[in-house]
Amino acid sequence: MKTVAFTTLGCRVNQYDTDAMKGLFLQNNYEAVDFDEKADIYVINTCSVTNMGEKKSRQLIRKAKRQNEDAYVIVTGCYAQLDPDAIAAIDGVNLVIGTNNRSKIVELVEQLESTERQINAVRDIMKESNFEEMPLFGNESDKARAFMKIQEGCNNYCSFCIIPYTRGKLKSRKIEDIVEEAKRLVDHGFHEIVLTGIHLGNYGVELPGRPTLANVVKALLEIPELYRIRFGSIESVEVSDELVELMATDKRVCPNLHLPLQAGSDHVLTLMRRHYTLQEYKELIAKLRSRIKDLSITTDIIAGFPQETDEDFEETLNTVREIGFTHIHAFPYSIREGTPAATMPNQVPEAVKKTRVALLNGLSQAGYEAYAKSRIGKPGEILIEKEENGYYMGLTNEYVNGKVKSDGAHNIGDLIGGIVVGLEDNYLIIE
């Protein structure tokens, strides 16, 4: 049996794409092995959000060839879509696929085997208008949570972001296809589904009848054995009243939202071409917290955007302190050629970016601890993801790490709960 190994850089959408490609190989009688092992085929799913993502992608390509010089090396994902010629020029790369056409990956490998010539299968993503169905079969992972992509592409064109150029226009998945995959995942033991997409909050705007993310959630709530529905990243301006009502009234819709802030300064938000003001963002947070009990809010913040002054950044720090995020994904601004921000004057020095990220990370940890401690004395429940050192471990509904003493009677994917009695090493202790 031929072996195939996968590695993934970047976001949850990329992880879904990897799992889906893995499923296609498994359906065709390949065996999946760890990327550090010798394999017949290596698949590297790349990222282009930052320069570091591209650097890591190149390193992984070379690592694969060192592990087995006779292996086929397949490079896919955003970096492959953005610069296929650069990928193809790397010694040892056999197949380049972008962010579309991946449903044919096994066929392309078979074509490789018959021709022994490099294949560049990257297509113009801007000409693609339909969602590429590449569903999970349920045997790609042994985890309790499954990521499920329901939307692709983005029309926002923020000044710093390369993703619209690598993922293309908005493309949404039909609700019936989403439900069919969700049922299959539940049948395979996945009791939490994380809905993901590049521009998740804009789900359905281009489909007939304009179905919404709330419509998707309502359809999924009809699946009895689906214990939890969680969302990936959603733009704050796209959180609808209908979605808020679902979160407020059905406990299976997790009280956790990832709402990218990107900057806590209106000056910087304008430069970024974001579609909200700081005041609008704060008002939404207040509204959400008034409606959704125990809501935890996580976010993304870019440090050191061009022209971000010390005063701008101090305003961001004050905003973070005021809102109290449960977690902040803080990262330094990275120049992406072809985006408006790349040519803006007054680029911030790397050392300043690093310092600002460190300050944000400190506030992130403080915010996590504050929220976690607020749970002490209240009910807590985890979906078991692993058993380790005598404890069942997993995430609570609110996206906080939790652990319960093992009794030997539960399995991965089960819900188990009690009362939160403490916090230890970033884990809630539940008894």
Predicted regions and their residues:
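Flexible glycine-/small-residue-rich
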Residues: 8, 233, 261-263, 384-386, ...
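Short flexible coil/turn linkers enriched for glycine and charged/polar residues
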Residues: 141-144, 154-156, 253, 263, ...
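Conserved loop-to-beta-strand segment in the C-terminal subdomain of adenylate-forming
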Residues: 255, 336-342, 430
